[in-house]
Each structure stands twice: as structure tokens, then as C-alpha cells.
Amino acid sequence: RESPAMKFQRQHMDSGNSPGNNPNYCNQMMMRRKMTQGRCKPVNTFVHESLEDVKAVCSQKNVLCKNGRTNCYESNSTMHITDCRQTGSSKYPNCAYKTSQKEKHIIVACEGNPYVPVHFDNSV
């Protein structure tokens, strides 16, 4: 079974890669990373930084998660990310996404031992 840490990596990590100016990046990646099976995941963020740098966020600035839990952390520096948002007209099984590249601080929820990211909460 996929662990929460592995699920985070599958859904959110795309190290050393960037969409460049490929408008189909999200369509390809959401499918490749199995987020269009059974339904279209409406919103997802990919982080284009090393796994080490993203894991390190778990020891950075402690902030409140959207759901009120206290195990979220905000990155000290901005990171290169891509937001994928399902387009209004797309319907399962033909999931279609808009690709937006951003430089933002990421907020992740961490748990376990070792203490690692298990949920992407937000970007600011």
C-alpha cells in the first residue's frame, strides 16, 4: 500500500523538471501521476525543487493548516511550483487542466518518523 509520504511524492514532486512553456504539462502529469482515475482531481500543485529541500520545510516555519491542525509548515524561501486547475468545461474521464507556473512559499503538513511532508496545504 502507498504510504502518505509516497503519495505526497507522487502527487506533488516533480524535481528538476519544469513545464517550460508546455501548456499540456498538467494534462500529461495529472494523468501520469494517476490523479485522473475514477474522477478528475480538481486542483493540484507540483513542486519543482529537490525532495531534500521540500522535506526540509518540515523544520521551518510552523503555521496553522487550513483544516485547523497545527502540523503545517511554510517554506522559508519561495519555490518554483506549477498549479494545475481543472477547466470548467472538462468532464471525467476527459480531465483537462490549466497550467500556471508560480514562485511561491509552500505550506505542507508533516507527520511520521522521520517527520516528512504528507499533504500539500497551500502556497502563499
Swiss-Prot record:
It catalyses: an [RNA] containing cytidine + H2O = an [RNA]-3'-cytidine-3'-phosphate + a 5'-hydroxy-ribonucleotide-3'-[RNA]; an [RNA] containing uridine + H2O = an [RNA]-3'-uridine-3'-phosphate + a 5'-hydroxy-ribonucleotide-3'-[RNA]. Residues 1-23 are annotated as: Disordered. Its main location: secreted. SUPFAM superfamilies: RNase A-like. InterPro entries: RNaseA, RNaseA-like_dom_sf, RNaseA_AS, RNaseA_domain. The keyword Signal does not apply. Endonuclease that catalyzes the cleavage of RNA on the 3' side of pyrimidine nucleotides. Acts on single-stranded and double-stranded RNA. Belongs to the pancreatic ribonuclease family. This is Ribonuclease pancreatic. It comes from Balaenoptera acutorostrata. The lineage of its organism: Eukaryota, Metazoa, Chordata, Craniata, Vertebrata.
